[in-house]
């Protein structure tokens, strides 16, 4: 099977005409107007062209079923920020226009198979896997300041990288005094001040999983049933918010690994503790350290989402109590999380306690 189509989307926060709101001026009296959106006479529909091809299959007398589909989505005239023209007089440094192009390519795979089919034993395993590669192919905008590139990456996308990008400084280690250092785009090391050029914020990964999926299994023996669901995702990054740095207000046991004496910079990336009263205090250190590339972590993770055991009460027992059928289920949700680092596990809520369930179902 294959398909090809074009979809459209209209802007909800932009219009061909100037929009403004009016309110009372409490200082000089009268009514005052404020422009909320500049006119956009060239506003057009966002258009997404989608082409896909897929195959559905069944094998081994329907014991193995599945499908695989490849897709290619190309978006044009996408709404994005563009740099404003100061002489227009509207007061906007950027405004929304049909100013972007983006591409998504990937595939989706679905499988379901009966591993065991017997009188007493039945075992079914199924799963789904999705892969998507996203890239901005055109946009005519640049962040006016580097902090906007960090704080609002989706408002200032870059060509050639994913839309949901994470940016940061390239880490240069600690200096001989235990202070954090980063590189700028020209390879210069900064320790006493933050790099200022937008190009100094380098692309470090996407915050959206490149691949994700689930594995479901159901094992049944006579009246007993065991079921589980495992979720996984990867290929993306997360910015660590659990940083061992006193100035960031986070308490972490990694602070015990901090720089204490000259030479420690060869063994640790945790800066020294410098109180604000010290002559060595640097107000830029927390910004350099928190936005450094060492704090953008691989976010690959596996989560056992559900685990349950169900007992189906025999029909002979149900009849004695005038019940058509009954079952008793004991289960757990959010059983455990596996991640590449304990910081990622913490940010994903992986240390939360599981939820326990007990369910009795009676059908009269």
PLM region spans:
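Tryptophan-centric aromatic hotspots in well-structured domains and transmembrane helices
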Residues: 43, 169, 256-259
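Glycine-rich, aromatic-lined ligand/substrate-binding cores of catalytic
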Residues: 204-241
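Flexible glycine/proline-enriched surface loops and loop-helix/loop-strand junctions
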Residues: 35-36, 198, 209-210
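Short, hydrophobic/aromatic alpha-helical segments in well-folded domains
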Residues: 54, 199-200, 212-215
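Conserved small-residue
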Residues: 97-100, 114-207, 247, 265-267
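A short local loop/turn or secondary-structure capping micro-motif enriched for an aromatic residue
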Residues: 75-76, 190-192, 235-237, 346-348
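Extracellular/periplasmic, surface-exposed regions of secreted and cell-surface proteins
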Residues: 1-158, 222, 291-364
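Extracytoplasmic gating/loop element in the C-terminal half of outer-membrane beta-barrel translocons
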Residues: 233-328, 332
């Amino acid at each position: 099977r294959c398909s090809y189509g074009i979809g459209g989307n209209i802007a909800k926060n932009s219009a061909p005409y100037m929009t403004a709101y009016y309110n009372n001026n409490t200082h000089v009296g009268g009514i005052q107007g404020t422009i909320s959106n500049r006119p956009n006479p060239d506003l057009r529909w966002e258009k997404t062209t989608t082409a896909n091809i897929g195959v559905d299959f069944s094998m081994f007398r329907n014991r193995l079923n599945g499908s695989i589909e490849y897709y290619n989505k190309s978006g044009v005239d996408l709404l994005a920020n563009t740099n404003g023209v100061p002489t227009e007089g509207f007061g906007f440094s950027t405004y929304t226009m049909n100013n972007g192009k983006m591409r998504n390519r990937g595939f989706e795979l679905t499988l379901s198979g009966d591993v065991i089919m017997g009188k007493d034993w039945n075992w079914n395993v199924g799963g789904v896997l999705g892969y998507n590669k996203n890239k901005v192919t055109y946009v005519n905008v640049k962040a006016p300041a580097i902090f906007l590139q960090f704080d609002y990456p989706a408002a200032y996308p870059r060509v050639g990288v994913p839309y949901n990008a994470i940016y940061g400084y390239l880490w240069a280690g600690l200096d001989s005094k235990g202070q954090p250092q980063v590189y700028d785009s020209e390879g210069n090391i900064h320790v006493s001040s933050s790099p200022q050029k937008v190009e100094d914020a380098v692309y470090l990964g996407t915050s959206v999983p490149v691949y994700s999926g689930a594995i479901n299994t159901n094992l049944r023996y006579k009246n007993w049933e065991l079921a589980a669901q495992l979720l996984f995702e990867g290929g993306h990054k997360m910015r660590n918010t659990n940083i061992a740095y006193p100035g960031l207000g986070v308490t972490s046991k990694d602070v015990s690994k901090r720089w204490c004496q000259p030479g420690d910079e060869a063994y640790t990336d945790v800066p020294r503790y410098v109180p604000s009263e010290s002559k060595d205090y640097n107000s830029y250190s927390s910004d350099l350290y928190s936005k450094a590339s060492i704090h953008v972590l691989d976010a690959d993770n596996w989560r056992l989402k559900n685990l349950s055991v169900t007992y189906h009460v025999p029909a002979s027992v149900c009849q004695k109590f005038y019940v058509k059928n009954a079952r008793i289920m004991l289960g757990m949700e959010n059983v455990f999380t596996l991640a590449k680092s304990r910081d990622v596990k913490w940010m994903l809520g992986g240390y939360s306690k599981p939820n326990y369930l007990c369910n009795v179902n009676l059908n009269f």
